[in-house]
Design a protein with these regions (language model features):
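Pyridoxal 5′-phosphate
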Residues: 1-299
Length: 299
């Protein structure tokens, strides 16, 4: 399974994959294990999960570094020219960027932001929780240092598995990420210190073998027709938007309009109702129409 995940994500080696219980745990392990220092500048996109933002906020209070938000245009898309100017004015030390929003479906230009950040020697962490299985990822061909993933979303694995993958071509995981969880792993058990290098430095305790095992079969299924799935979902997304626009009182957030915008969008859409609170609308759609939606704030 580790080899399958590494190939699917375009990692350099299978050993670059570390399994955790979730993307949330992976984000905490990476961010808490990294050596943030006072006066560092950390950039985030406006689309980060709370697994990233709450962890960074706790660390900011402790370590006294700065957190800045990457600039966007009037539609909420990242503005690369403005970001380039941001980096010139306050050089980045660390950049966190979501590959695809779980709220609006927007696919962020993460690779281009990573290229810009690397000009200043910054470390780049990308969150692929919503993207993995929806878009093609080839980590070793990018300037992204660390990739976080969730197994239960569009990778179609069971709940209880996630992880992080490091780009060993440009990032030394064992040197730069200190373990934050300690325990047994069946290796060198008489030694009270963890290994200084390798998978066993990070994977401790009893892994969720069942959930991890599902990823191999799930990825096999995805790989049979990823491009075909993307095309079908794109058609369904266009159809949904077309029909929603026929209904008065509905607002579509960050609606893709051009073909380029549709290509940079996964099959996730957020809408609002003029006459209903989101929770009320969700209850009506569920109870009267058997339509399942997620309502309220997203994590």
């Amino acid at each position: 399974t580790r080899k399958k995940v590494s190939e699917f994500m375009g990692a350099e080696n299978a050993e670059d994959v570390i399994f955790t219980s979730s993307a949330t745990e992976a984000a905490n392990r990476v961010l808490r294990g990294y050596g943030f220092e006072e006066n560092m500048t950390v950039y985030v996109s406006p689309y980060e999960h709370n697994a990233v933002m709450r962890t960074l906020e706790a660390l900011r209070k402790e370590k006294k570094f700065k957190i800045k938000v990457l600039e966007t245009d009037e539609k909420g898309y990242l503005n690369l020219d403005d970001i380039e100017y941001q980096f010139m004015c306050d050089e980045p030390d660390f950049v966190c960027i979501n590959l695809a929003s779980n709220v609006t479906g927007y696919v962020l230009p993460a690779e281009r932001v990573a290229d810009m950040a690397k000009e200043y020697g910054a470390i780049v962490l990308a969150d692929a929780a919503q993207a993995a299985g929806n878009i093609e990822i080839n980590l070793k061909e990018t300037n992204i240092d660390i990739l976080i993933f969730a197994g239960h979303k569009s990778m179609y694995g069971l709940f209880g598995v996630g992880g992080f993958i490091t780009n060993s071509r440009i990032f030394d995981r064992d040197k730069n990420i200190t373990p934050v969880i300690f325990g047994g792993n069946g290796e060198d058990s008489l030694n009270l210190e963890l290994s200084e290098r390798g998978i066993s430095r990070y994977e401790v305790g009893s892994p969720n073998i069942a959930a991890i095992g599902t990823l191999k079969t799930a990825i096999d299924t995805i790989e049979k027709d990823l491009s075909g799935t993307q095309e079908r979902e794109n058609r369904l997304l266009k159809y949904l938007i077309e029909k929603l626009e026929d209904i008065d009182g509905i607002h579509i957030f960050q609606k893709p309009e051009t073909e380029e915008e549709f290509q940079n969008h996964i099959a996730v859409l957020s809408i609002g109702f003029e006459k209903y609170m989101s929770d009320d609308a969700g209850t009506i759609l569920d109870g009267e129409y058997d339509i399942a939606v997620r309502t309220g704030y997203h994590c």
